[in-house]
Amino acid sequence: MAALGHLAGEAAAVPGLGTPCASRRHRLSGPVSSAGNPSTVCLCPGQPTCSNADSRAHPLGDEGGTASKKQNKKKKTRNRASVANGGEKASEKLAPEEVPLSAEAQTQQLAQELAWCVEQLELGLKRQKPNPKQKEQAIGAIRTLRSKRTPLPRKRQLMHSLFGDYRAQMEAEWREALRALRAAAYSAQVQPVDGATRKKSQRVCRPRPIWRAKATLDLPDEEFKFNFF
């Protein structure tokens, strides 16, 4: 009896054909456990070995590459914009400021403005026909502008009240005069004549025959008379 019990225990220990349920359970345990456990191993294309949970976290290879390219493009555009802004700021810093005029230049400019205003008033008196009141006002303004006792703010106020923006008017008049001078200088230049024009206006000078010259010289000195008979 002891020997039969020992043989039965060895048969139960070794798996054989008589235990199909155990082998099926052993085979099905792998897929069931992998489906139930989210941390089972899978292979993602283009990526190292990872779990299913990690595969949800990172995108696929192509999507990740496009996202990284977009980020790089955004960074490049930002860098270019910052460089451009920096260049504009540097150019603004390097731009020279307007140099104020010296005392001598200011005095000369004021003299030119006063002379222009006085000239305009005198031309208005000559060309126009002002009434006595306007004539008196113009003469008084000329005296005020030419007076050395009148303060400078008073002169500028008077010029502004009479002519408005007199500096802009002076600039426009100066440009017009410069344009007229350029036109006169251009018209005064000797321009070459075309060959066709020279051929049309060309004159042929030929010497006179000798016999005609002698005939005019050998005329007698007799008085000319009409011979009707």
UniProtKB/Swiss-Prot annotation:
> Is Transcription among the key words of this record?
no
Disulfide bonds listed in the record: none
For the region Disordered, what residue ranges are annotated? 55-101
Name the keywords, alphabetized: Acetylation, Methylation, Phosphoprotein
Q: List where this protein forms a coiled coil.
A: none
Pfam family membership, one: DUF4615
Residue positions, PTM Phosphoserine? 82
Query: Which residues get modified to Omega-N-methylarginine?
Result: 27
Keyword Acetylation in annotation: yes
Residue positions of the PTM N-acetylalanine? Answer: 2
Q: Basic residues bias: where?
A: 70-79
Sequence similarity: Belongs to the UPF0488 family.
Could you tell me what this protein is called?
A: UPF0488 protein C8orf33 homolog
Give the organism, scientific name: Pongo abelii
Where is the organism placed in the taxonomic lineage, from the top? Eukaryota, Metazoa, Chordata, Craniata, Vertebrata
